[in-house]
């Protein structure tokens, strides 16, 4: 099967595992997905992730995070820039997700970073996804 949007697949797998209250989820690896996983970990949306090398593409195992009463930490994931309709923003027009409660993940010339980091560095780029 040919996958037309691997980032949407990544977000959907995390969303589905989160809704089913799984402790972890395995996703085919890529450098973009590793960057997204690092951002989710640094922002506190996932517990951890590890890259498992299988001498091919590899897999990323993401360990989901839940609150003390088993409530979900990730309440929403949304793909913004799609292969058929790319969404680019300038540094002045960087989006805020839920008035700063969520994050926007931006692919910039400085790498894949959050909207907060993009504001600090004063760079724009492609809006990959919103997470809240």
From Swiss-Prot:
Keywords: Ribonucleoprotein, Ribosomal protein, RNA-binding, rRNA-binding. It holds the Pfam family Ribosomal_S8. It comes from the Bacteria. GO terms for biological process: translation. GO terms for cellular component: ribonucleoprotein complex; ribosome. The keyword Metal-binding does not apply. One of the primary rRNA binding proteins, it binds directly to 16S rRNA central domain where it helps coordinate assembly of the platform of the 30S subunit. Part of the 30S ribosomal subunit. Contacts proteins S5 and S12. Belongs to the universal ribosomal protein uS8 family. This is Small ribosomal subunit protein uS8. The gene is rpsH.
């Amino acid at each position: 099967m040919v996958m037309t949007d691997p980032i949407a697949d990544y977000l959907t797998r995390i969303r589905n595992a989160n809704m089913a209250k799984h402790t972890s989820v395995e996703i085919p690896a890529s450098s973009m997905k590793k960057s997204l996983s690092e951002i989710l970990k640094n922002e506190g949306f996932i517990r951890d992730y590890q890259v498992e090398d299988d001498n091919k593409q590899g897999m990323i195992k993401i360990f989901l995070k839940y609150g003390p009463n088993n409530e979900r930490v990730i309440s929403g994931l949304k793909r913004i820039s799609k292969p058929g309709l790319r969404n680019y923003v300038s540094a002045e027009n960087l989006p805020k997700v839920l008035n700063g409660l969520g994050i926007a993940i931006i692919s910039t010339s400085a790498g894949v970073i959050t909207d907060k980091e993009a504001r600090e560095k004063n760079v724009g780029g492609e809006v990959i996804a919103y997470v809240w």
